[in-house]
C-alpha cells in the first residue's frame, strides 16, 4: 500500500 498521502491513500494506490 502506498501511503504517501494518508488523506487519500486508497485513491492514490498505484499512482504513487
Swiss-Prot record:
Activity across pH: Optimum pH is 8.0-9.0.
Oligomer status and interactors: Monomer.
Entry's transmembrane regions: none
Keywords: Lectin, Manganese
Note: Requires manganese but not calcium ions for cell-agglutinating activity.
GO molecular function annotations of the record: D-glucose binding; manganese ion binding
Temperature dependence (free text): Active up to 60 degrees Celsius.
Function: Glucose-specific lectin.
Similarity comment text for this entry: Belongs to the leguminous lectin family.
Any single biological process term in GO: cell-cell adhesion
Protein name: Lectin
Lineage of origin: Eukaryota, Viridiplantae, Streptophyta, Embryophyta, Tracheophyta
Disulfide bond annotation, renumbered to this chain: none
Amino acid at each position: 500500500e502506498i501511503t504517501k498521502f494518508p488523506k487519500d491513500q486508497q485513491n492514490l494506490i498505484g499512482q504513487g
